[in-house]
Amino acid sequence: MGVQEKDPLLQLSLPPGFRFYPTDEELLVQYLCKKVAGHDFPLQIIGEIDLYKFDPWVLPSKATFGEKEWYFFSPRDRKYPNGSRPNRVAGSGYWKATGTDKVITSQGRKVGIKKALVFYVGKAPKGSKTNWIMHEYRLFESSRKNNGSSKLDEWVLCRIYKKNSSGPKPLMSGLHSSNEYSHGSSTSSSSQFDDMLESLPEMDDRFSNLPRLNSLKAEKFNLDRLDSANFDWAILAGLKPMPELGPANQAPGVQGQAQGHVNNHIHSDNNNMNFLNDVYAHPPNFRGNTKVESINLDEEVESGKRNQRIDQSSYFQQSLNGFSQAYTNNVDQFGIQCPNQTLNLGFKQ
């Protein structure tokens, strides 16, 4: 009988949901440097394998630990006996470098380089590109051992994963499932939605005059007028219907003010309609003595304005005498000479 392999998580009694998601600096300093120095790890999270002997889709079964990403310590062989280029042939294809190398630092000190590679099936340079990606971490030249062997590096650290290119991309690329990253919090989705709401443009004031918003404002006004001390909580729970707040339930002061505003608007509209009817019923004759008729019409309009000003000013003459005197006593220090404008307050006797 074979010996049953133990799960690394069970060996350390780690709780469910544990994920191995180290940073680039941690992979180089805490794992690769220690591996090159001959350090033994108490928990074998990263397996040891020559990954250039296998196709990438076989590597997950060779890994010690991992769900979506798999980590390996692997040696690198030289492409030529005395050269410094690595041999990238692996399995039924080859690994091809892509992008630019990234220098990894720790406490302001350069410790290693991160390189991205893509696996191609077939022979270079006419291979077929796949979705398998490798991130290769290696130490700097000064930190590597050169003993004249065929191996370019004793150990490099590699992260293998398959890029998922099928299916539509998610709406928010910043969201990740808990199976991919261990440090993702449960509040990441809510923060993304808050950012989306904050990015929406603010509504202009013209939208506040929409009928639906006006009805909502009226309902809010009616709810605010309810006395909280006498409010029946059964209404809030939906056990009783909400009482209608019509004109009979409104306060006398509010009802009187509302009726006054309506009467004023109706009276003003009637005056405007009467004026328009008179104009259309008696249009001016422009073919005869146009100049004389225009002068007469202007005199009638000016006479009507003067009468209206006299009627309104007589009602508030006592209140406006002090204001008028204080206004006329002011000296125009800047020489602007603003024209005197008649104050039309819109009150009727």
UniProtKB/Swiss-Prot annotation:
Pfam hit, one: NAM
> Any idea which residues the entry calls the DNA-binding region?
111-169
Keyword Lyase assigned: no
One GO BP annotation is: regulation of DNA-templated transcription
**What is the reported tissue distribution?**
Expressed in guard cells of the epidermis.
Output the Gene Ontology cellular-component terms.
nucleus
Q: Which UniProt keywords are listed?
A: DNA-binding, Nucleus, Transcription, Transcription regulation
Annotated compartments: Nucleus
Q: Where is the composition biased (Low complexity)?
A: 177-191
Q: What is known of its domains?
A: The NAC domain includes a DNA binding domain and a dimerization domain.
PANTHER family assigned to the protein according to its UniProt record, in alphabetical order: NAC DOMAIN-CONTAINING PROTEIN 72-LIKE (PTHR31744:SF233), PROTEIN CUP-SHAPED COTYLEDON 2-RELATED (PTHR31744)
- UniProt-recorded name of the protein: NAC domain-containing protein JA2
The protein's organism comes out as Solanum lycopersicum
